[in-house]
Amino acid sequence: MPPPPHQKPENVLKRAHELIGVNQAPAALTLLHEHITSKRSRNVPIASLEPVMVLLVELSVEQKKGKLAKDALYQYKNIAQNTNVGTIELVLKKFIELAAGKVTAAQQKADEVQSSIEATNSTSVDDLEATETPESILLATVSGEQSRDRTDRAIVTPWLKFLWEAYRTVLDILRNNARLELLYQSTAMQAFEFCLKYIRKTEFRRLCELLRNHVQTAAKYSTQMHAINLNDPDTLQRHLETRFQQLNVAVELELWQEAFRSVEDIHTLLNLSKRPPKNIMMANYYEKLTRIFLVGENYLFHAAAWSRYYSLLRQSAAVVASGQGKKADNPPATPADLQKAASFVLLSALSIPVISTTRSRGAMVDFDEAKKNKNSRLTHLLNMSQAPTRAVLFKDAMSKSLLNQARPEIRDLYNILEVDFHPLSICKKISPILAQIGADEDMKKYVLPLQQVILTRLFQQLSQVYETVDLEFVESLAQFPEPFQVTRATVEKFIMNGNKKGDLSIRMDHGTGVLSFDTDIFSSSKASHSGSAAGSAEAEGGSVQRLQRTPSEIVRSQLVRLGRALYTTCYYVDPSFNESRVKAREAALARAKAGAEKEHREILARKDIIQKRKEEASDLQAKREKENAKIKRMREQALLEAEQQRLAEEQKERERKRKEKEMQEIRKQEAESLIKDLKIGPNALDVSAEDLANLDTSQIRAIKVAQLEREKNDINEKLRITGKRLDHLERAYRKEEVKKLHEDYESQKKRDLDAYSKIKEETLKESKIKHEESVELKHRLSRLMPFYEEFRANLQERRRDEFEKRRRDAERELEKQIAQRKKEYREKKLREKRQREEEERQLREAEERAAKEKEEQKRREEARKEELARAKAQREAERQEMAEKAALQARREEEALERRKREKEKLASAPPASAAPVRASESAGGPPRLNLAGAGGKPSWRDRVPSSNVGAAPSERSERPSERPAPARTGTPMERTDSNDRAGGPPRLNLARADGAKPSWREREQAKASGGPERDLPPSRAASGRGPPMHRTDSGRGENGRDESPAPPRDSLTASGAPGKYVPRWKRENAGN
C-alpha cells in the first residue's frame, strides 16, 4: 500500500483553518499532528513549519490534548535543533503562555461563579436573626450548593494539571541541550513560581526529582551532540541559581526534607564549580540551612550555620568597604544586620543542649557509625574541616568579639549561663531576659532549648552541693515567666531522660517528694561532667563553675594528691635529695655536651639517608603511578571500545527491530485495509480481530477475490432478472400501444395541420410587414444617394496617395511574411526529414539488436533442446538397460524354476526304496530342506505330525522317514493369491512379445528339455493378457507346504513367444483393462 501523498505546510495550514471555520477543531488538530510527526516533514524548511506548530499548540491547549502536543513538540525539536533554536523557544514559550492564560481564565471564572453563589445565598436569607441549625447545615451539605474548594476542583484544577504537564513536558524536551539551556533554566524558574503560587507541594517534589534526574543523566550523555558541560562555569552558575531558587521555594512551602536534599544538590554543584560562588548566594545558602536545622531540632549544626553566616557577613562587609567586590554580589552587611546575626549566633550556641533529652536513642548512640556519617555529611555541607562542638563555637564567638556586637539581653544571658551561674538565683535573673526573647518572634523559638540547658546546669550544680533535695525546692528554683512556665511533669520527664542516657544519676521518691543524688564514691563520674548524646558536649573542664569536688573525684585523685605531698616533703626535709638531683642534672649536661658533635654528625648523615630514601621512594612512586596511569588508560580505552561496540550493536539491534516493526505495521495496515474493503458493501464479510491475526495478506486477497467474484455473480444475476423483467414490460407496453396507434396518428395529423396553417399565416403576415418597411426605407435612402456619391468621390480623391502608400506597404509586408513562412516551412521540412532519418536509424538498430537477440535466443533454445534430447536419450538408454537387466534376471529365475521342476519330476518318477523321500523344503518354492535326523534315530516333528493325522501305530512312529510312504493329500489345493505363475518367490513379469509369434527363451528351453520342436510350443499366458493363476498343486506342495503327490494342472502352460522385453506395470494394467 503506497504512503499517502505529502502535502506542503502551507496547504496543511490552510486546510486546518478551513476545518476550524466549520467547527472541526479536533480534525484540524489531528491533521496538523500527522503532518508534524511525518518523516517527510524533516526536510521541510523550518520557516514553513513554524506557523503549523504554533497553530497546533493553540489547538492542543484549547482541547487539552497534552499528549498530542508532547509528541509534536518532541518531533519539532528534533527537526529544528540543528538549524534554528529560536523557533523552538518561540513555540515552547507560546505553549506555556497559553496554558498559564487558561489557568488565569479558569480562576477568574471560578471567582465569578463563587461570587454569584455568595450573592444568591445572601439574597435568599429569609430571617437575618435566625441562627443555623444542625438540620440546615446537613441540608446545605447534601444539597447542590458549591463551596469554594468544590468550584476550584471543577474549574481550576484541570487546568492546573494541564499547566503542570506542560512545564514537565517542556523541561523534558529541553534537558541536556546546551543550545536550549537558557530556556530550560527560565522554564524551571517558572515552574517553581507555579508551585509556590498555587501551593502545589506534590508537584514541587516531582519537579525537584525531575531536575535531579536531568543533572544525573548529564554526565551519562556528555558525548552526545550539544550536551551540557557542567565544567563550564556559566552552565554551573545557572544550575546553581536554579537550585537556590528550588531551596527558597522548598523553605517557603515548608518542605524541609526536600529543602535538605536541595542543599545537598547545591553542595555537590559547588564542589564541581571551579569559580567561587557569590557571597550573596552563600549567605542565602547558610540562612536556609539555619532554618532547616532549626526545624529538625539539630541545635548544634543550627548554631554552626549561624556562625558561618555571620562570618560571611563580616567578610562581605570588609570586601565592600575595601572596594574589591561589587555590592550586588554581596549580602547587605549593615551594623543592624551584623548585630542581629551576632545575637542569633550567641543565642543558638547557648541553646545547644548540654545533655541529650531525647527518648528514642540509646546511651551509645554517639558512637554509632550512622550517626558519625550523618555528622560528617552535615559538616561537609557547612564547609567545615571538623565537626563543631559547643565549646568550639563559644571559643570562635569570643575570638570574633561577638559579645560586643550582640544585643544586651543576649550578652547578659551568656554571662548568667556560662560565666556566673548560680543555681539559687538563676531563674530570677533569667526571667526578664526570657520575657524579652519571647517578645521577638524570631527568637521565641529558642526559649524551649534554653530551658533544657538551664535545667541541666541547675541539676549539675545541685548534685555537687546536696545529696538529697526536695522536689518542691527544685520547682521553686525552676521558675520561668508565665508563658514559659515549667511544670512538675516536665521536670520529671527531664530527669528520667537524663537518667536513661546516663548523663544524670538521680533517684526520685514520689512518696516523700525527694530527689536523691548518687553519692557512691566508686560510681561513674559521668553525671559530674557535662556530656551530650548529640555530640554537643563541652570539652573536659568546660565552662561550668565548679563549687566543690564530689566524693567520687576525691577518691579517684587520692593517689595523685599523696604523691604530690610526698614530693614536697622530701624537697624540704632531705637536702641530699635535692643535691642528688642537681648532680644528676649536671652529669646529664656534661654527657650531652661531649656527644653533641657526634650526635650532630649522625643526625646529618641520617638526614641525608632519609632524603635519599625519600627521593628513591618518590621515584618509585612516580614510576608506579605512571604504570598505573598507563594501565588505567588502557583499561579505559578497552572499556570505551567495548562500550562503543556495545552501543553499535544495540543500535543495529534497535534498527533491526524498528525495521521489523515497520514491516509488521505495513503488513498489518495492508491487512486492515483489505479487511476494511471486505467489510464494505451489502455482501460484507464479518472478519474479527482473532481471524485477522491468523490470516496473511495472500489469504486475505484470496478472500477478497472470492468476495468480488460473488459480488460480480450477484450483479450479473440481478441484471439478468432486471433485463428479463424489462423485456416483458416492453412487450406488454407495445401490445397495448398497437391498439391506440391509429387514433394517435389521426389526432397527430390534425394537430400538425392546424399548426402548419397557423405558422403559415403568421409568416406571410410578418413578411408583408417587413417588405413594406423595406420599401419605405429604400425610398428614404434613395434621396440621399447623390450626396453620398459626391462625398465618396471627393474623399477618394483626397486620400488616393495615402491609400496607395499603405497598399504598397501592405504588399511589401505580405511578401516578407510569405518569404518568412516559406523559409520556416523549408526548415521545418528539413528538421522533420532529419528526425525521420534518425528515427529510422534507431529503429533499424533496434531491429538489428532484436534480430541478434532473437537469433541468440534461438541458438540457446536449440542448444537447450539438444541438451534435453541428449539427457532424454541417456535416460532412455539407462531405462532400456535396466529393462534388459530385469528381463535377464526374470529369465534366469524361470530357468531355475524349470530346472527345479524337472528335478522334482525325476525324483517323483524314481522308486521310493532307492532314494530318500523328497522333503517339503526341496520343492519349487525355495531351497532344499536339510534332512536332520533326531537323536537316537527318533523321527522329527514334521515326520510325526502326518503319521498322527492318519492314525499310525506306535511301531510305525519309530520307522525312519525314508521308509515311510508319502501321505495322501485329499483336500483341495489352496490357490496362491500373491503370485500369478508360481508358488514361491516374486511374481513373474508379464513380458509381451514384439511380434506376437516368436517364442521366448524360456519356452524354447522348455521345448528342448521335452525333446519337441519349438513350433509345437503352446501359446503363452501373456499372449492373451494374463494367464491363469498358479495353484499349489502345480508346485507339488500341499496346503501346509508339505510334499504331496503331484496333481495334474487344470490348464496347460503355453509359451508367450515374447522376446523378453520389459513392460512397465502401468502398461500392463492398461493392456489388461
Curated annotation (Swiss-Prot):
MF terms (GO), sorted A to Z: mRNA binding; translation initiation factor activity
Coiled-coil stretches noted in the UniProt entry, renumbered to this chain: 596-737, 790-910
Extent of the signal sequence: none
Domain PCI: 338-522
Disulphide linkage map: none
Residue spans of biased composition, Basic and acidic residues class: 798-907, 1000-1018, 1031-1045
Cellular localization per UniProt: Cytoplasm
One biological process term in Gene Ontology: formation of cytoplasmic translation initiation complex
Protein function: RNA-binding component of the eukaryotic translation initiation factor 3 (eIF-3) complex, which is involved in protein synthesis of a specialized repertoire of mRNAs and, together with other initiation factors, stimulates binding of mRNA and methionyl-tRNAi to the 40S ribosome. The eIF-3 complex specifically targets and initiates translation of a subset of mRNAs involved in cell proliferation.
Family statement drawn from the similarity comment of this UniProt entry: Belongs to the eIF-3 subunit A family.
Protein's name according to its UniProt entry: Eukaryotic translation initiation factor 3 subunit A
Classification lineage: Eukaryota, Fungi, Dikarya, Ascomycota, Pezizomycotina
Chain's gene name: TIF32
